[in-house]
Amino acid sequence: MRERVRAGERGAFAELYEHCAGAVYQHALWLTGDWSTAEDIMSETFLTAWRARERVDTEGGSLRPWLLGIATHKAENARRGLRRRVAFLARQRRTPVVADFAPEVAGRVDDARRLAAVQGSLDRLRRHEREVLTLCVWSGLDYQQTAEALGIPVGTVRSRLSRARAKLARFADEAQKKTEPRAGRGEMTGEAALAALPVREETA
């Protein structure tokens, strides 16, 4: 696959898109909290990959880490202009639901709430911590693949992820203290759930 992509074979790029477009879109969605922006980032990622195909190393495994690395940088750039739009999504809970479309709209609103909550947690992390967390935890890359995607050492991936988890755990403790009278026994906050998600170990 790598040799075919590097050679500019359109069939290889079609296969790459089919296998990885969903992962790229979902990764961009988690980082930006906006469906439309995530779609744009997905398209831009593959366009950038096509233009940079000659830099692909013919040795190696899946190209997914490479694509997610491109998407990460584009998403972080897009985040700067998305704060007002994320706030809009969070306000949709107050939008009346038309009966004929109630299930679809209600599902969309629920997704918007979750995305807004995730964005609130991610916004409290530093950019480098946020990038590593989303790649390792949500996009399912192992430490080595995340290092490849971001162009940093594996040790740096581990340390940044550790700091991100520690901060999320601290945020969860703070949130629990503020809402303790209303919290259910054993109930996890969004930050605690994020901090507890596992990371895939390196593949052999």
Regions found by a protein language model. Name each.
Residues 4, 87, 93-94, 148-149, ...:
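C-terminal edge and immediately downstream basic/flexible tail or linker adjoining helix-turn-helix-like DNA-binding
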Residues 6-7, 30-33, 44-61, 81-83:
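Sigma70-family region 2
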